[in-house]
């Protein structure tokens, strides 16, 4: 189970079939809300073709094993997480393509604040560019590459997800290359030019957001003005009637 892979925890005891039958969807939702602050914290990776009725039973068994464990988890209590953990799943599709995902989770030794998040974001932008150049553009057989760094403020840890699609027989080769690229970027760090490019991109995004918010605010204000002035509505209705038809 992914829970056993991503978290070093002793609460994943399998249930008997009669216990699974008693575990409802509402119970599963309650357990999920109790354990995880975000839906992104829980991931199901299904390898191969599984019938829907079997899949539901598997997920129910998974959540039920947490809910009915001998050591229940109190609400708000953090999970016992592995300090460094990675898992790789290769999933065959209808076409001869493999999806490869690798999770790495690290304990955060620095405060989780805005500065930390922006530094991680800047690093991930540079890393993602390295991965695209070295895996997708230079190494044949890889079709898409994505890199994502995220911070969990409650657990105070950092997780990194690397994912790409490639030819099934080459996923080990591509994964090795990806890890080499990440090690080089960690050693190199971020140059001043890369940091400036990141800052410019962030500023452009903020400018676009600010303009969008301003346009929305203007629309709301204009609507309120018309709402308070019935004459404005009457004038618009008269103009609509006078519009020519074709």
Regions from the PLM with identified roles:
Residues 1-20, 39-47, 98-117, 132, ...:
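M16 family metallopeptidases and their MPP-like homologs
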Residues 16-19, 31, 58, 122, ...:
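Short, hydrophobic/aromatic alpha-helical segments in well-folded domains
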Residues 33-36:
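Surface-exposed acidic, glycine-flexible loop patches that form ligand/cofactor-binding
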Residues 38, 43-108:
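An aromatic/glycine/proline-enriched structural segment found at the starts
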Residues 59-63, 123, 175-183:
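Short amphipathic C-terminal alpha-helix that caps PH/PH-like domains
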């Amino acid at each position: 189970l992914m829970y056993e892979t991503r978290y070093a925890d002793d609460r994943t005891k399998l249930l008997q079939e009669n216990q699974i039958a008693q575990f409802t969807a509402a119970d599963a939702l309650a357990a999920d809300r109790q354990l995880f602050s975000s839906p992104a914290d829980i991931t199901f990776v299904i390898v191969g073709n599984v019938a829907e009725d079997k899949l539901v039973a598997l997920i129910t068994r998974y959540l039920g094993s947490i809910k009915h464990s001998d050591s229940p988890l109190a609400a708000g209590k953090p999970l016992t997480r592995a300090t460094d953990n990675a898992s790789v799943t290769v999933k065959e599709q209808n076409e001869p393509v493999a999806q490869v995902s690798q999770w790495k989770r690290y304990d955060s030794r620095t405060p989780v604040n805005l500065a930390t998040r922006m530094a991680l974001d800047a690093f991930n932008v540079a890393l993602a560019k390295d991965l695209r150049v070295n895996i997708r553009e230079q190494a044949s057989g890889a079709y898409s590459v994505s890199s994502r760094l995220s911070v969990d403020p409650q657990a105070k840890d950092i997780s990194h997800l690397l994912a790409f699609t490639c030819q099934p027989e080459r996923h080990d080769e591509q994964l090795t290359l990806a890890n080499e690229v990440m090690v080089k970027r960690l050693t190199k760090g971020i140059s001043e030019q890369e940091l400036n490019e990141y800052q410019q991109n962030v500023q452009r995004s903020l400018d676009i957001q600010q303009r969008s918010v301003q346009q929305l605010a203007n629309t709301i204000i204009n609507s309120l003005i018309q709402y308070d002035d019935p004459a404005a509505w009457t004038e618009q209705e008269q103009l609509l009637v006078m519009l020519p038809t074709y």
